[in-house]
Amino acid sequence: MLSAIAKTLTQLRKLGLVSLIVLDGGQVSSRKLLREQSWRVQQAIETFGEPGSILLDQCIAEAESQTAQTKGFMPSGVYIQHPHLLLRALRDNAIVVVPPVTMAHNMKSIDVVDADETIIALTKFFCGLQFNASESPVGAPDSSLSPGAKVASVEKVIILDPAGGTPLSDAHDDSCHRYINLDQEFEGIMYGLTHPTGSEARRGKYPENVRQLHARNLDLSKKVLAMLPSTSSAIISTPSAAANKPIQQFTSVTTRNRQNPLIHNLLTDKPVFSSSLPLDRVRSGKKGDMASGETHVATLVKRGMPLTVYPDPTISAWVPPRPGGPRLRLTDTCIDMPRLVNLINDSFNRELDVEHYLERVNENLAGIIIAGEYEGGAILTWEKPFDLDEETAYKTGRLVPYLDKFAVLKSRQGSGGVADVVFNAMVRGCFPEGVCWRSRQDNPVNKWYFERSLGTWKLKDTNWTMFWTTPHLPLSDPKLLDYENVCRYIEPSWADTKPPD
């Protein structure tokens, strides 16, 4: 496996990404073991030819206490010494191996240090954030490095751990998050890892030590990405996944999981499978399939963007308000209506008839999802079948959860995962029991909808296709007739005369 991982790293180098490797030997690690394993890694890389690999086992030093390195932004007990050696190796396109061993600032001892601290110190150095690490730094200073100057561009942080990607708390197997939007999800995921539910603990789904590993890897990702541009990302995966061949002949969709997540992410800046795809769409589906164990072993992590949801489903579940009772409206002060209208107009490439739209949705609004600074969003409503009055629909439980508008700014479409973030918030947080919507049959976005819905229906004598995410809904269920009734008769609200979207 080591040779296969070394090959992946050399292929990443050919694609423009030069790696720096920090080994983590665990709590029982010794200086001797780390140096031996570092040498093995170096030799494995060297077998793939020039420019090879360089082992630098003296570039980490212990920082003196009460300095900016130990007390300032993102504190670390170690710092980078002999930076000219490190930079020379990287300029030569060599893959650098750095064992987490350090010499004390008094030059009297050499100790094993925490690998995460080493990674944080390296990131601070590359970002130009290493200040006053020692009053008397060891080694010759590099006069070309001015304080605060960015030394190198860190594009990816790759964490290879047998524990694999960050697990999904609500999955019944070992599936993991495919994408984590830190701004939105970090606190909730960390809480789930550190406070497992009783049923999970009883089942022994994830032992305490494994959950601690997952929490540590995610916390490290957050700390490192906090120092990097928003375009940088972290990948948490297994060594075996990193050893996969980057290119294979695929005979069916179910084998796509065997793609190398490192190569795939570098080429696309996306996870192997979109985070908004239903789990069943990306599982192998065949017991005994050798690939099934690798279905969800990689988690892509980004700083992402904040997500605002009104009303907040973590406080109270979305339920239909009583007719005549208080409810959220698009004209409420918490919603920036001009920016919302701009988002819709830009995404649909047509102008919304605002007055007509407000008349139609303001009294049956279920909620609104806003990604970032109105870069994406969704407007959801409670719709009554057109042959019922609101009171009857409410009392009989026939109000339909409906996705009225799903919009992403053109500048954010196809990148950044904005659509995935909004869609996941809708189906996991706001309407976990299902939501329906409609789209023109010739809409190019329909492929994306087909992949994420749990059912579709072409509405006879119309140009509409209806989609829904309601689980376990047979075609004989009368609920589908209510869905169809709503999707068939919703009146569009555009200021132009083009066919409705």
Question: Each predicted region: which residue ranges?
Answer:
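Nucleotide/pyrophosphate-binding catalytic subdomain
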Residues: 1-241, 330-337
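Conserved acetyl-CoA-binding loop-helix of GNAT-fold acetyltransferases
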Residues: 414-427
